[in-house]
Amino acid sequence: MRDGEGIWGRGRTGGHAHPKEAMHTTFFILGGTMLIGVISDTHLYDRAFELPKAVFDEFSNVDLIIHCGDVTDKEILDSLKDLAKVVAVKGNMDYLNLPRKEILEINDIKIGVIHGDVVYPRGDRLKLRLLGKEMGVDVLISGHTHTPFIDDCRDILLLNPGSPTVPRCPLKSIMKLSVEDKLEAKLIPIEE
C-alpha cells in the first residue's frame, strides 16, 4: 500500500506447512487499493540468464509479488523482495524450500496460488476450476503452461501470468492485480 492510502497488515497461519498443504496468509486492507504483481516460470539460469528490466519497472509500484513457481534460483526471489513482499510456490523445476500451494486472503477475496504441474492436460481449465473449488478460493493463479490467460470460469477466476523469459507463445508476460472491493487482473506484455 503506498503512502497515504491506508494501512495493511499480514498474518500467516499454519507455520511451516507440509509441502502438499497450503500455507494461509491473510492481508487486511484498510482504505485504498492493493496492487499485486504476478509472475511465473522465470527459469533463471536453467533456461534464462536474467529477468527483463521491464519486470522490475512494472513491479516498482506493487505492494506484493506472487511467484507461481519454476523460480529455479533464489536470486530471483531476493531481487523481487527488494521491490515488495513476495509469496512464492514451488514449481516442478524448483529445488527451493517453498510450499506447493498458498492461499491468500485479501479482505474477503481468497486467492489460491499453485504452480499447476498437478493438472493434466497442462493448463486444463476445468481441472483448474475444480482444484480452485477444492481449495475454497475465489481466484486461482497458476503457472506451468508459460502461456497467459484470464478466464472467468463460472464461479472462479482463473489466472496465469505466462512467462517473462521463456513463453510458449509469442508473448512474454506478467500480470498485475488490483484489489479493493473486487479483484481486477491485467496482462502486461514484456518488451525486451
From Swiss-Prot:
Pfam families: Metallophos_2. Transmembrane segments: none annotated. A divalent metal cation 1 binds at D41, H43, D70, H146. The keyword Zinc does not apply. CDD domains: MPP_YfcE (cd00841). Its cofactor is a divalent metal cation. Its EC number is 3.1.4.-. Binds 2 divalent metal ions per subunit. Keywords: Hydrolase, Metal-binding. A divalent metal cation 2 binds at D70, N92, H115, H144. InterPro entries: Calcineurin-like_PHP_lpxH, Metallo-depent_PP-like, MPP_YfcE, PdiEstase_YfcE_CS, Phosphodiesterase_MJ0936/Vps29. One of its GO terms (molecular function) is hydrolase activity. Belongs to the metallophosphoesterase superfamily. YfcE family. PANTHER family: VACUOLAR SORTING PROTEIN VPS29. This is Probable metallophosphoesterase MJ0623.
